[in-house]
């Protein structure tokens, strides 16, 4: 210890000797601002006023407790250690530049106070934690500079303060139990229609569950209400087996005893289009209305994230509240469980975050616990834990207790448990309630959160599902476009007589939208046996409908005509008499298949294709460079493949090496010009590891051939280069991405989402303590772009939903597919625990041939993100050739860049669109 104290004295002397007038003034200012915690008291009051209500009080109390207990402990410890002040103990020491304190030196009370307040404040406001800790560090350093403490004193004070700063929230949680509360106990179930069992298997459990629920609600008036998961399709599934139960359901819905809707299915809200979300609500409200009414709270139990524009959609349907469980990050500590969620459009809804998930109060009850005394004992044991987990986040005195979880029935002993809450905690008034009653009791929140919610601090967000079983995403995108861009507009302009057929097709497609279905995170049989026929029905019947309606609108005749599904004039290359031909199309209409004026395309050299705008130079490995012929600028290298091992599951990607790329591979190349389209094909072989090793930490050394064919095409007049990649996957446990260099550096990029283009930062911050830390991979729709008028690129992808951007914006990677062999695993470093049962899913390895379509749009002068978005929409919505009279007709036109069409349907009650 003597050596430590000697070093401490030397360090003190060196620091004090380094004083100059400027440092002295700053140190004096900091130490006096911290006098009796002045700055921290002010900060606590500001936090109180900012948060408002009880939550503001709890935050201020947390800061004050951390500060006061730290100071009291430090002052008590001084009398234990009795270390003299340095200006008294060190001969010839410089005098302090503030008033000499009279107490002992170790530990520093001011430093303890500062760290106690800073650590407590940082737990309430995580984004300000670095600032608070820096300020506390400055306080400790200032106490040394002014000459009243050794460095070791400040360090000891920091340790004491940190301890009490960490202890403050649990202390406040204990205090909260003593306050009066209103507990709204919502009985519910979360019914996954298909997941680790097939739909019909789960229905065999659904039918008796609904039957017993109806009996319970009719028999026991104490069981005031039950919430059926925010969706309506389970009731339809039940009535297929027991149609006689419909009057009972209607009576309970009308009596506000059974809460249903507003959704038709609980979809994954990120993977489906914005229009699919609208149709989901439309159908859910329609079905719920047939039973009596829909719940007036937009409740979603378990989607893996929430799109930025959802508040606007909800407002459009008259909803002003949203209850959810996943998606919140560090901002949840500041916002609390109730806050205003704002969309880019400016629309807001009150959002209620179920901090403890949608089963936060399930421990209050248990199957088989029926004697009232046993129920009371269970409530006495579990209630404090539940209160401690959710009360600190509440904006007012209303607490949401969710009693239910996946596939659970109603708990008959719940009324006894609710009565026991009042006996165990007399100041807590508990009632079986609805989400509507809870939202009505929530005070107007002060906090505002803007944008999408896709973070995993409290619950895993599971966005590895963006690229799991990618064929599902591709099929869904194709079906959505078929209905939105062809079937519905053609029906609208031909009289709107096929409304019921379209509704039936939408209902079939919506059956594939629940998160366990479209995310690809169920057993193989769900996806291969149940989902494929639904997609097939939408495809076949939708295409037949298009044929019938287009024939009606195009008129009698055998002349080739071209249909354009987009409401602006555009040039397209379509097959006319077996030859790719450029045709000018009317806006959202039909035109004669007559070749338009064009300079055409050419192939001046092997691997080189040219139109009037672009020159594309393709290498033997399938990568290419784009040259802008107007500005003579060259892009970065496009279309490089990167393959990484994947030791994860259907929910989460987990890296396993080594990484292998296509750069430098030698493929077989062919170049040809067909009419107004030039194509370079490249056939190459990627030698990839066959699978993971048996320990699953790395890939095996055995290599297998994975064949790849690129068809890189350039149409006459086009501003984009199209790529069709056909991959014959022979490897297991890996992820394949295509990488394109942007040619620029930027801190942000633009990504397409439901009803929005979102600007996102390139860099993903590292987060400790999250259930699932952020990853570079994110979800997108249609386009992702880095750059603008000064250069860069935009990528468009057909049905692909996952991408990442390098931190400096120099490259964009789009995931083509993931190959995994388990529904869930519990040994992944990227996520805590299991996300489902550990079941093998060999079909999720996606072996065999797969085809991917994407395009590259060079950005620059005259082509920014809006123009690129139009070009990508044209790539994704090809015109089609039919027969008719040959007369041109346009049914709808939208003028002005960058206007985009979303949907065209006939109003149900008016003779208009």
What annotation goes with each model-predicted range?
Residues 179-279, 287-289, 316, 452, ...:
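N-terminal catalytic cores of secreted or lumenal carbohydrate-active enzymes
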Residues 1-41, 74-103:
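N-terminal transmembrane-helix/juxtamembrane module of multi-pass inner/ER membrane proteins
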Residues 185-186, 190-196, 201, 347-551, ...:
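Catalytic grooves of carbohydrate-active enzymes
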Residues 49, 92-178:
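Membrane-embedded catalytic cores of phosphoryl/pyrophosphoryl-handling enzymes
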Residues 42-73:
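Interfacial segments of alpha-helical transmembrane regions
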Residues 310-313, 335-337, 353, 363-366, ...:
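C-terminal (or distal) subdomains of carbohydrate-active enzymes
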Residues 189-206, 229-239, 262-278, 293-305, ...:
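The substrate-binding groove and active-site-proximal loops of carbohydrate-active enzymes
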Residues 277-316, 381-400:
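CE4/NodB-like, metal-dependent polysaccharide N-deacetylase domain
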């Amino acid at each position: 210890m003597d050596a430590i104290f000697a070093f401490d004295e030397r360090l003190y002397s060196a620091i004090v000797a380094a004083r100059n007038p400027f440092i002295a003034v700053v140190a004096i200012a900091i130490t006096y601002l911290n006098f009796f915690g002045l700055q921290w008291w002010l900060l606590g009051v500001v936090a109180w006023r900012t948060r408002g209500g009880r939550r503001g009080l709890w935050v201020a109390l947390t800061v004050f407790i951390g500060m006061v207990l730290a100071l009291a402990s430090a002052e008590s410890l001084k009398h234990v250690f009795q270390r003299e002040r340095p200006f008294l103990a060190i001969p010839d020491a410089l005098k302090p530049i503030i008033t000499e304190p009279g107490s002992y030196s170790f530990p520093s009370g001011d430093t303890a106070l500062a760290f106690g307040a800073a650590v407590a404040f940082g737990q309430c406001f995580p984004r300000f934690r670095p600032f608070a800790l820096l300020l506390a560090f400055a306080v400790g350093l200032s106490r040394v500079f002014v000459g009243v403490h050794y460095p070791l004193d400040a360090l000891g004070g920091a340790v004491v303060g940190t301890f009490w700063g960490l202890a403050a929230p649990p202390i406040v949680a204990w205090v909260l139990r003593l306050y009066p509360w209103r507990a709204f106990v919502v009985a519910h179930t979360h019914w996954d229609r298909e997941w680790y069992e097939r739909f019909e298997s789960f229905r065999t459990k659904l039918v008796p569950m609904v039957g017993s629920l109806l009996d319970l609600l009719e028999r026991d008036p104490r069981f005031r209400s039950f919430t059926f998961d925010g969706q309506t399709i389970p009731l339809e599934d039940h009535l297929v087996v027991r149609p006689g139960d419909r009057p009972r359901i209607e009576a309970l819905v009308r009596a506000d005893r059974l809460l249903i809707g507003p959704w038709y299915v609980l979809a994954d809200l990120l993977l489906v289009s914005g229009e699919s979300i609208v149709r989901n609500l439309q159908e859910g409200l329609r079905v719920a209305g047939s039973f009596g009414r829909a719940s007036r709270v937009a409740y979603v139990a378990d989607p893996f994230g929430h799109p930025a524009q959802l508040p606007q959609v909800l407002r459009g349907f008259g909803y002003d509240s949203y209850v959810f469980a996943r998606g919140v990050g560090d901002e949840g500590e500041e916002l609390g469980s109730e806050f205003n969620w704002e969309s880019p459009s400016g629309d807001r809804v009150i959002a209620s975050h179920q901090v403890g998930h949608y089963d936060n109060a399930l421990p209050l009850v248990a199957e088989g616990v029926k004697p009232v005394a046993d129920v009371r004992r269970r409530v006495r044991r579990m209630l404090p834990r539940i209160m401690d987990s959710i009360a600190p986040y509440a904006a007012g005195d209303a607490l949401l207790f969710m009693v239910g979880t996946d596939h659970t029935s109603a708990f008959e002993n719940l009324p006894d448990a609710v009565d026991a809450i009042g006996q165990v905690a007399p100041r807590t008034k508990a009632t079986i309630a609805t989400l509507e009653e809870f939202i009505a009791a929530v005070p107007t929140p002060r906090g505002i959160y803007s944008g999408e919610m896709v973070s995993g601090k409290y619950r895993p967000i599971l966005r590895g599902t963006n690229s799991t079983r990618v064929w599902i995403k591709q099929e869904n995108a194709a079906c959505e476009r078929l209905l939105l861009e062809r079937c519905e507009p053609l029906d609208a302009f031909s009289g709107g007589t096929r409304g019921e057929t379209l509704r039936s097709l939408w209902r079939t497609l919506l059956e594939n939208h629940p998160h366990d279905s479209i995310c690809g995170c169920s057993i193989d049989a769900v996806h291969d046996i149940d989902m494929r026929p639904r997609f097939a029905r939408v495809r076949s019947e939708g295409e037949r409908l298009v044929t019938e309606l287009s024939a009606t609108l195009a008129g009698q005749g055998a002349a080739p005509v071209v249909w354009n599904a987009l409401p602006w004039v555009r040039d397209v290359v379509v097959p006319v008499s077996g030859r790719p031909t450029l045709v000018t199309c009317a806006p959202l209409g039909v035109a004669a298949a007559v070749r338009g004026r064009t300079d055409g395309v050419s192939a001046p050299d092997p691997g080189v294709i040219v139109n009037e705008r672009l020159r594309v130079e393709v290498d033997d490995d399938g990568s290419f460079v784009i040259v802008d012929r107007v500005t003579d600028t060259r892009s970065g290298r496009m279309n490089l493949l990167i393959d990484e091992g994947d030791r994860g599951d259907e929910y989460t990607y987990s890296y396993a090496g080594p990484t292998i790329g296509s750069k430098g591979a030698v493929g077989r190349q062919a170049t040809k010009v067909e009419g107004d389209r030039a194509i370079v094909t490249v056939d190459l072989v990627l030698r990839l590891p066959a699978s993971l090793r048996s320990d699953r930490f790395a890939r095996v050394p055995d290599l297998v051939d994975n064949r790849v064919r690129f068809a890189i095409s350039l149409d006459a007049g086009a501003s984009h280069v199209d790529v069709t990649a056909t991959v014959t996957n022979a490897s297991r446990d890996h992820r394949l991405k295509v990488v394109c260099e942007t040619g620029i550096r930027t801190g942000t990029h633009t990504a397409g989402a439901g009803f929005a283009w979102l600007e996102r930062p390139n860099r993903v911050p590292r987060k400790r303590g999250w259930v699932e830390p952020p990853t570079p991979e994110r979800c997108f729709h249609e386009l992702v772009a880095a750059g603008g008028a000064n250069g860069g690129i935009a990528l468009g992808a057909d049905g692909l939903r996952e991408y990442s951007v390098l931190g400096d914006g120099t490259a964009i990677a789009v995931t083509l597919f993931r190959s995994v062999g388990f529904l869930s695993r519990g040994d992944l470093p990227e996520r805590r625990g299991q996300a489902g049962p550990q079941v093998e899913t060999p079909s999720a390895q996606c072996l065999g041939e797969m085809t991917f379509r994407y395009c590259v749009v060079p950005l620059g002068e005259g082509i920014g993100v809006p123009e690129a978005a139009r070009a990508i929409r044209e790539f994704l919505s090809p015109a089609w050739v039919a027969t008719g009279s040959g007369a041109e007709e346009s049914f709808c036109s939208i003028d002005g860049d960058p206007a985009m069409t979303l949907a065209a349907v006939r109003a149900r009650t008016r003779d208009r669109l």
